[in-house]
Amino acid sequence: PGVDVAVRSSATTEDSAEASFAGQYESYLNVSGESEIVEKWRRCVASMFTERSVGYHLENDMHPLDSSIAVVVMKMARSDKACSGVMFTIDPDSGHDGVIHIGSSYGLGELVVQGVVSPDTYTIWKEGLRMGKFPIVYRTLGGKEQMMVYNEESTNEVHTIQVSIDERKKWSLSKDECVSLAEMGLKIEDYFGMPMDIEWAKDGISNELFIVQARPETIHSKSSESKMMLYKIDEKLTSKLKKDGR
């Protein structure tokens, strides 16, 4: 009683190494009360048989009746008072597997997942992370124009509000938090033995970071085209550049 939860679907065939069922099944945020939880569970199960879901099964040579579904009920992290986002243990654009990519924006993570907002982005060097060196090699301040929060005037609902210009100019995630998330992502990748697509949330009350979902990355993970080359600059050239002020 009095605990807000997320009711999330998870199918046995979802997120296999060959196909990702991301977004095919229903999930619900900020749900409270036994009757509402049961109703949202029913809708999650029923979402296996939508036209979209059945079509996706057939496109990937899977029979819909060969699938089963689990529905996870998990306590909501109060990311509406902080931030949330996504994390890929592979570059989502190039497929380069030597980096971790983090996207972060204010509020619940749905707007980041759906691509509605432009999040802050961070690129983390995996090898540097493993060696205990400062691993953030690049970060970009996103627009973060909107955020999804609890609707205090309506039970069991969320809504979208505008973010102030001052808040948009700030980083939604600190460097230390970014490194902590990347360490979690690396552990998850090592455990599953493959690049992962992860969703995370920061609780604005406890300031804790939570992993709320992890699935195999299915777009670039099977490609071996991307490579990273390391070059060591000659010490004489380094000294000359410093002397010249470059």
Model-based region annotation:
Residues 1-246:
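Conserved mixed alpha/beta core segments that line enzyme active sites in large multi-domain catalysts
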